[in-house]
Amino acid sequence: EAMPRVTAVEVAGPGFINLRLRPDWLGDILKRVEAQGAKYGHSNVGGKKIVVEFVSTNPNGPITVAGGRNAAIGDTLCSLLAAAGNTVSREYYINDALNSVQMNNFGRSVFTRYRQLLGHNDEIGEEMYGGDYVVDVAREVLALHGEAFVNADIDDPQTTRTFRDLSEKGMITQQKADLEAFGVTFDTWFSEATLHADGRVARAIEIIKERGYTYEKDGALWFKSTEFGDDKDRVLMRSDGTPTYMTGDLAYSKDKLDRGFDRAINVWGADHAGYVARTKASLAALGYDPARLDVLLYQLVSIVKGGEVVMSSKRKGNILELKADLIDEIGKDAARFFFLMRSPYSALEIDVDLARKTEKDNPVYYVQYAHARIVQAIDTT
């Protein structure tokens, strides 16, 4: 068959064929690249309205290095979908309906640090959160409220609630700042708590009950998720009347599609693989096509420095922070490059020492060097 863009076809050893392309056609491509600039390669083939939910770190800790891989994958996926002609919304799901014990302990941790900043010698309990990020949130509370809470009793329910809320807001502010330093911003920060507060969770459960996909056992309300391919049925409401984590998820998935999105894409860590079947099952039980939800699972990431895997942050704490332990070490651009250099489905190891090198074995430097040479060549023509 004729190939007008090819001038010659040559066999080049066993298993290889060389295609020689017409120079004038290649020249035309370069002209289009120059004319279209950043829009080169874009198309209108998509035409869908898509919401991509990614990162969604709990509001009781900073964005971790693993969360950084999630951010790089999700943000790039959004850009690709938009370039293909889709209307894309970047969404961060705030898990602010977390177990009250977790968030209350986080609030207590911030309160203790807050009083320490004011010169008190309060002890940090074993159940409390460590890490410099807790001190950062306490500093923000101090900056906003001064000594207003210095004599407060953390065992008082009102004080507990106040510091839970202040700590959550302070942590989310820190998360936003870390993500912006990584070049990632969101169109929507969606609160899980609102789903419970305005009845959307209760309504979703009611729909599943009306459609006959629940039963009661041992005082709890169960979802017949096995009828949709899940490996076992799931509890929706515990025997004490409290909802499980799944109820917020199913109401959130429903809400996305109710907002008019044709497709929803979630970017999750591989440790959440078990949630995929039950999430799709809940959509089917609610009467939606589960194929409208896609889940991209990515593998873990580790940091290597001095030939050793880094196990703890350079700041106090037992987690690796995206900003302090990676961006501040190698820069935003290098961090994003390394996160995207391997398939999301493969485990990733980032060598900090390699990323800092100004030699060709550092892939970031090699690409930047090639770009600089190309620009130089253009400037001399």
Question: Language-model segments: what does each one mean?
Answer:
Residues 1-381:
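NTP-dependent nucleotidyl-transfer catalytic core
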